[in-house]
């Protein structure tokens, strides 16, 4: 938490109530094996909020097959950097041991590493859903961050990010 530069209110990261008329861009990192619910749940919720959010889907390839076998297309290439004020959502995958061992996951992990400086500078916010926290941990994004994940991968999260403050049963 910090104070908003415009209104002085305490805010998480970069968003504040003074920017209610702003459209916030939300970027969903979309990899092969993405959990359908982890992607569509947050996306649908934000879509229902109206024009306050612009949803973008990014990843190493333009089309992936998700956990339900459905093909998701229209995925944009990974941008060099996220614009200031963005929200990055890293959804989980159906089997992180398999899905995060792919060339696409390696490319996404490298891209996430390149975003670390901007994340530390709080120019964008990071939200991980379920095992998406493991990918962020592998990219070094969770050092000194209070975090949790699905109980099946919490041990791997703690191993991938020993400096993260991983918590169980949250």
Regions found by a protein language model. Give the residues of each.
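A conserved active-site-flanking secondary-structure segment within enzyme catalytic domains
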Residues: 142-170
